[in-house]
Amino acid sequence: MRMTEISLAGRLPVDSYGPGGFRIEGAWQAGSLVLSPGGVHGFEPPVDAEALAPLVAQADAIDVVLIGQGAEIAPLAAPLREALEAAGIGVEVMSTASACRTYNVLLAEDRRVAAVLVAV
């Protein structure tokens, strides 16, 4: 089997997640985060229009946003989903653990992805 190393240069993979935060590119970030082509932004849960504003502003660089709602899956409010979809951004809601894994896979595939991650 041939192994190929994947380079995520210039991207922001989630190295790990744990109690109260995330390790992004080797640095611990406490709290809930928005990861986008424009960088890392913190926010206070729950996910609201203010947390999603940086994504809408970058809609031309994002095809899909993964929303990690914490330890359990919780629906995203319809007006928030509609605002993202109106901006041309697809939305997938899942647990934070699933969102972290899926985000990293999509980054490795060089997809135009962002993530909203509620800390667990």
Kindly label every feature range from the protein language model.
Residues D48-A59:
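A short, acidic, amphipathic alpha-helical segment used as a generic capping/interface helix at domain edges
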Residues A59-M94:
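Mid-chain, well-packed structural core segment of small domains
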Residues A86, G90-V118:
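C-terminal structural segments of small proteins and small subunits
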Residues G42-E44, I73-L76, R101-T102:
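Short active-site-adjacent helix-start/loop capping segments
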